Amino acid sequence: MGGKWSKSSVVGWPAVRERMRRAEPAADGVGAASRDLEKHGAITSSNTAANNAACAWLEAQEEEKVGFPVTPQVPLRPMTYKAAVDLSHFLKEKGGLEGLIHSQRRQDILDLWIYHTQGYFPDWQNYTPGPGIRYPLTFGWRYKLVPVEPEKLEEANKGENTSLLHPVSLHGMDDPEREVLEWRFDSRLAFHHVARELHPEYFKNC
């Protein structure tokens, strides 16, 4: 008896079962597609390119051939609290994000790299609206967006070698409030979900 589900065919199942049991919940603040992944283990028809901005954006990246493969090399999953904290620490240790001027293009590149290498669906890096400091909606992500001081902007735009297309020279064109923002690490964001306190309306379905 046993057929195709005999003992020999389920080698490794205990490890898979244990991995499923230990699967972490999605972090507070991730998007609808990540909630699908958490609940069903896949993105369902309730989140498609037609009705979900993150799905539509990802599909567009795949069509554009953005410079590296956009199909993840690991299983697709939602961003978790622990993963967001660990990723924040990794980027802080490696450098490169702290004080970097934010632009949508730079955020897209970061999201795609994380999606490709870690499998986290790119609907987790969202922030509270401005003006002023923008706090991450995803609990555990320890980078906030902070307006750059006018003096620092003035200094950065001096000289003939300034690129007009550099985010610091675009004077906040990416931002609804026309503020130039930079990523800033804040260790307290691992313990204090500021976005949830400021905007509880964003978390009604969490």
Swiss-Prot record:
Motif (Diacidic): 174-175
Post-translational modification as stated in the protein's UniProt record: The virion-associated Nef proteins are cleaved by the viral protease to release the soluble C-terminal core protein. Nef is probably cleaved concomitantly with viral structural proteins on maturation of virus particles.
Lineage: superkingdom: Viruses
A GO-annotated cellular component: virion component
GO biological process, one term: symbiont-mediated suppression of host autophagy
Lipid modification (N-myristoyl glycine), residues: 2
Modified residues (Phosphoserine): 6
Annotated site (Might play a role in AP-1 recruitment to the Nef-MHC-I complex): 20
Region feature (Mediates dimerization, Nef-PTE1 interaction): 108-124
Protein's UniProt keywords contain Membrane: yes
Record key words, sorted: AIDS, Apoptosis, Early protein, Host cell membrane, Host Golgi apparatus, Host membrane, Host-virus interaction, Inhibition of host adaptive immune response by virus, Inhibition of host autophagy by virus, Inhibition of host MHC class I molecule presentation by virus, Inhibition of host MHC class II molecule presentation by virus, Lipoprotein, Membrane, Myristate, Phosphoprotein, Secreted, SH3-binding, Viral immunoevasion, Virion, Virulence
Similarity annotation: Belongs to the lentivirus primate group Nef protein family.
HAMAP family membership: NEF_HIV (MF_04078)
UniProt function note: Factor of infectivity and pathogenicity, required for optimal virus replication. Alters numerous pathways of T-lymphocyte function and down-regulates immunity surface molecules in order to evade host defense and increase viral infectivity. Alters the functionality of other immunity cells, like dendritic cells, monocytes/macrophages and NK cells.
UniProt-recorded name of the protein: Protein Nef
